[in-house]
Amino acid sequence: FLRPLGLRLCSNGNKQDTHTDTSEVVFSRQGGVYDEEFELELTSKGIIYYTTDGSDPSESDTSIKYDGEIKVADRSGDANIVSAVSPTLFCTNFSDYSKDAGLVCRIDAPSDDAVDKCTVIRAAAKDSAGNWSAVTTQTYFIGNTTDHIDGIEAGCKASGNDLAVISITMDYDDLFDSGKGIYVKGDVFDNALKKFIGNKNWIKADDTRKLDANYSQRGREWEREAHIDFFEMNENGAKQVLNQDCGIRIQGNYSRSDLQKGFRLYARKDYGDNKFRYDIWGDELKDKDGNTIDKFKTFVLRAGGNCA
């Protein structure tokens, strides 16, 4: 069962679970699409800290002590961060390898104005004993949905559904670190390439797609923690239907070496709720008794590759 999908990715700093049950932070506005910039109010019984770069406010050195409303504005002019990562690190669209030139990616990172942007606010509160609440995360788009997604009206009309847009917030290193990053070729690829090249002076670029890499690893060891905000969007606006911490892995076979990769999301008690509780496919997906299935342990975000 397929649905059209839009994906936004925001990476954060290193994360460890140091949170306990205390007064969580309440946001004055739910994540979504807003026509104009606004002032966001946060409330809690504890002292609130927040971040705007996707990092965990209970750990990050970029966290800000909340002392008044936060301006949420259009970020279309901001510089790229995740999208600025060199494609050479995570895909194999290379020119042929030679010892003189090495591996050179034929695709450049996109320009700043080519990447749609949103604002991710993460907040946590600390009580008088120094205990942190769970982190609350919300994602905001400023402008109309048509400003952010070209052709959304025609796309929704053609599919007969709203566009499912998922914002993913996770640790930057869990994506791009050479040792543990799941999105990159990484150390696994570098070691495999050394063995494959041996004494060769030249190899075909396509051969590198078949080499082992970080992104081709599987199993729980290569699952990372993430947060998702799931929106149903059309030309008239957006509705947030899921706001949840979960596990994330790379999805696919040969397509794992593509520029854009698929993801598989896992609901587990380790992260919070053990199910994604939403009828993602509406009435199209029913159980044997004819009831709409509205709880899932996992689902896949396809990237459109041949094995995605």
Residues covered by each model-derived region:
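Short, compositionally stereotyped local motifs that mark structural "simplifiers"
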Residues: 1-217, 223-225, 230-235, 239-244
